[in-house]
A protein has these predicted regions:
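Stable alpha-helical elements in mature extracytoplasmic
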Residues: 21, 25, 76-79, 83, ...
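Periplasmic peptidoglycan-binding/anchoring modules of Gram-negative envelope and division proteins
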Residues: 50, 64-98, 126-127, 156-158, ...
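Short, low-complexity, glycine-enriched hydrophobic/amphipathic alpha-helices that associate
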Residues: 1-24
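Amphipathic, membrane-active segments
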Residues: 19-54
């Protein structure tokens, strides 16, 4: 019973930590054109059934990158810096940076582009003081669309970089 109580207290502390980080991130992104934030419960590890609150910051790729490029546009640094400032205040989280593309172009090309874009955001965050040991990157190419690729508006939503901010297990 003591273990359950201790686990509950740790869970409550982690929840409050993520609550505060979410509030600070929402404030930092209040006027952002290129980024949005969402919070959801996710099961991170099927074996332990550890479910946690995960914050996801989504950057619209059109604001960060030119078409077919993984080089950050000058205005992208301001948007990324808003996020970096909050990440630096909350070091007890890990960050999974994922790149996504629309379905235009070959699967191989989109996969490589999504990986390069995720790495570009990671490198910018490192340059802004975020500890590289906290971050991993992954490219999904066109495999995880959030909208239809049949319209330009849908393709625009699918071109994105997401940061999943996950509390570290205490």
């Amino acid at each position: 019973a003591a273990g359950a109580v201790a686990g509950g207290l740790v869970g409550t502390a982690i929840g409050k930590y993520m609550d505060k980080q979410e509030a600070d991130m929402r404030q930092a992104l209040a006027n952002a054109e290129a980024a949005s934030i969402q919070r959801e419960r996710q099961v991170l590890d099927e074996a332990s059934r550890r479910d946690v609150d995960v914050l996801t910051v989504t950057f619209k790729s059109d604001y960060l990158f030119a078409v077919n490029s993984s080089s950050l546009l000058p205005g992208a640094y301001d948007e990324i810096n808003r996020v970096a400032n909050v990440l630096n205040q909350y070091p007890q989280t890990t960050i999974v940076i994922s790149g996504h593309t629309d379905s235009t172009g070959s699967e191989q090309y989109n996969q490589a582009l999504s990986e390069r874009r995720a790495n570009s955001v990671r490198n910018a965050l490192i340059g802004m003081g975020v500890n590289p040991a906290r971050m991993t990157t992954i490219g999904y190419g066109k495999s995880k669309p959030v909208a239809s690729n049949a319209t330009e508006a849908g393709r625009q939503l699918n071109r994105r970089v997401e940061l999943r901010i996950i509390p570290q297990q205490q």
